[in-house]
Amino acid sequence: QKLCERPSGTXSGVCGNNNACKNQCIR
């Protein structure tokens, strides 16, 4: 699963979940 990337560099939550931070996907 791809995770969301915060500006702090830490991953938070699952990318694509309810379109949450879909522009910050970590591959």
Curated annotation (Swiss-Prot):
Highest taxon in the source lineage: Eukaryota
Record-linked InterPro entries: Scorpion_toxin-like_sf (IPR036574)
PROSITE patterns listed in its UniProt record: GAMMA_THIONIN (PS00940)
Pfam (any one): Gamma-thionin
Gene Ontology BP term (one): defense response to fungus
PTM-bearing positions, type Pyrrolidone carboxylic acid: Q1
Keywords per UniProt: Antibiotic, Antimicrobial, Fungicide, Plant defense, Pyrrolidone carboxylic acid
Subunit composition and interactions: Forms oligomers in its native state.
Role played: Possesses some antifungal activity sensitive to inorganic cations and antibacterial activity against B.megaterium.
Protein family: Belongs to the DEFL family.
Record protein name field: Defensin-like protein 2
Species annotation: Brassica campestris
